[in-house]
Amino acid sequence: MRYYPHNKGLFILRKQVPKHFPGRRMRDSKAYYGQGAWGEYVSQAGRISGFLFGYDVFNITVQTSLFCKRLSPGVSIMYMLKGSFAISNSAQVLKNVNCYICYLPRGETNYLLEEGHQCCFSLLFSVGNLNTLAPNIEKLQTFKDHIQQAPENSRLLFAGAITKNARRIIDAFCSNEQEST
């Protein structure tokens, strides 16, 4: 089981993904299926360029707001909210909301998903882990090793938990990703 924003999006996961579910699968990955506040959901885990990624697909059945904060070109922190929220209130709204680091092809920062849309994004690592590891990390390679050993449930991020040390590591990771692409 895994909790999503506001603890209202409980998904009970199971390995069998229905054939009707849209979207492609990651090669050599385990897929888990569930249902919850936003509709159907598939979570996958696989390695891309040596990093352990979670690739999640939501088949949206309710109106959902996505708010993305840019970290660097192509890399964002995404907040998934049920309903429609004004960005001017984001500081209050997002204080205790789960967020995710994700890759987006364009610079959209706030958009609404209607019923029937899909939402796909990649989860990388938990801010909680970053805060714990930050004082001891000298090189990105060490960080990569820690991420590969991170348990499945550590992929959740929390908006209020980002410290300066965590931000430094995120920035280092993002700049490294840009150089390698």
Spans of features found by a protein language model:
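Glycine- and acidic-residue-biased ligand/ion/polar-headgroup-sensing regions
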Residues: L71-S90, V127
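N-terminal low-complexity or simple alpha-helical regulatory segments
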Residues: M1-P73
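Glycine-centered secondary-structure boundary/capping sites
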Residues: F21-G23, G83, K139
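Alpha-helical bundle regulatory/interaction domains
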Residues: S88-T181
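Generic structural motif
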Residues: F58-Q63, K82-S84, S126-L130
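Short hydrophobic beta-strand segments that form the core of ligand-binding sensory/regulatory domains
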Residues: Y55-V57, S76-M80, C120-S126
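General N-terminal targeting signals
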Residues: H20, R70-V75, L140-T142, I147
